[in-house]
Amino acid sequence: RIVRETNDAIAFEDIAPQAPVHVLVVPRSHFPAARDASEQVIGHLVHVATQVATDKGLDNRGYRIVANTGDDGGQTVHHLHVHLLGGRAMKWPPG
């Protein structure tokens, strides 16, 4: 389900959620990984993620925003995207 759209990005619920709130924020243009995108693109994705977090009521308790990059970073989809996770306490280290 789409939860937010801009001219440059789309945010939708993850099909295999790892938290009560798990939203992917994806640029409309293709970038294989974070290293391939500009500061403006990455900043916009994080900004959209924070807007979704507010929409989902996560501001008071907190949330996590993460982008997996490369094999060791756990990237399995080679199109830049950020994960917004919230609705439960996050652990560190994550994995």
PLM features: what roles do these ranges have?
Residues 1-95:
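HIT superfamily nucleotide-processing domains
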